[in-house]
């Protein structure tokens, strides 16, 4: 036992050696220490900083923290505010829409994807401030889907190259869960959380159906971590974690970046990247602060605005040298944008389930993640517990055609329902893309238009996932089931590739066209997988930072 405690202490010291963020919160864990925020380093626009980073979400915050620790002068911009969890977040669905990117956007295509809620974020921490906290890894097979399955695209990096960065981020968040048997089997820094009625229902049904399910992995502290408290299981992870038990860059990487001299400029909308017409190098960013246009000089620029805003920014950065948009000589910017199919199936039970009393995803199976040669579709899906809160639950019920007294009956029955959600690997297609619309936003910038249409393989996957969720719930004793079709998790739009004709960035997240411009967000992912992408985005950004520190010049 003493040896185990010693090993745990050594692992903790290793985390603190590379990321002190959890110890840089106030002692009650409620927010970043005020002296770090109020006394952060402030650069002038005329200071040529080493790097300007656009976006403070999963990718941008990790890059900022790594480079600040390496001694780089770094400024990160975010279009939204620097959140104060206790002040800005509420345990209320309707009162949490300010966490989303609600600026104008257009959607189209055969199967339009709603924007502005679960797949967007605006503010320091990005969409991770309102994500569910679920952080599985991608599988080794995700990196070779074209070679192995004849669909999607191969990554220019391998799973093995990303593994050490997965491990680092899992320790820094930290992640809690059972030993994971799928993909590359591995364990997690913290043990699993207690299981709720929803999770128990999933485990019981999966066992009867012959399906393996496991608890975790969640980026939620199971016990105190630094100044962060234990989860209190209030069930409002998607509305921002008021106690800061759930990890987000706002508390996991930003504090350490500030402590090492980085600046975070909140409420600053970056409008374009400036490129020197003679040298072809990025020299800074144009941005709006309090409605006033400004320009920050920088030796390098990194974009981390995610899969809608990153392509939009590149396209809005057109110039004489790049008339069709920055880095768009081969018409790759905005293409291959993906979502996951995310149908949710609920089952009614005679016992009370109280599905909201836990992190929304807490039990999962990845048994159906890989291509099954006996099935008529390629790739696969995962299944997790989900726990729609009352307003979302009402939307589920109304989607089945229930209104009036019937709707009221389903709402009063809320505590008797359990709910599962699938993540289906929808495939990258070139015509699923972001372009610029004629409409302009309040800054006078063309807004993004996102066109999306499913392929036959996508539809087959969603149908198969629904059937499996129904089987699990019925095996657990559900008396009735209902399913709502939905989407989750945008990725792609500026994908990494081995060749400039097939993508926007190389294996190290440098753009092919501009040698000192990087992209470090979910837009660089060539495929989607059936896993929540946050951990992979952070690991890719950590790897890009590592390569950049080793070799600042290409």
List the model feature ranges, each with a label.
Residues 95-182, 371, 430:
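Redox-cofactor-proximal catalytic regions of oxidoreductases
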Residues 66-69, 73, 80-90, 243, ...:
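Glycine-rich loop(s) and the adjacent beta-strand/alpha-helix scaffold that form part
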Residues 527-546:
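A conserved FAD-binding loop/helix module that cradles the flavin
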Residues 49-76:
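N-terminal Rossmann-like FAD-binding beta1-loop-alpha1 element of flavoenzymes
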Residues 19, 23-24, 48, 215-219, ...:
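A glycine-rich dinucleotide-binding beta-alpha-beta segment and adjacent secondary-structure elements
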Residues 5-28, 111, 146-270, 490, ...:
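Conserved redox-cofactor binding core of oxidoreductases
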Residues 4, 17, 23-29, 107, ...:
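FAD cofactor-binding and catalytic pocket of flavoenzymes
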Residues 1-51, 69-70, 550-554:
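Extreme N-terminal leader/targeting segments of oxidoreductases
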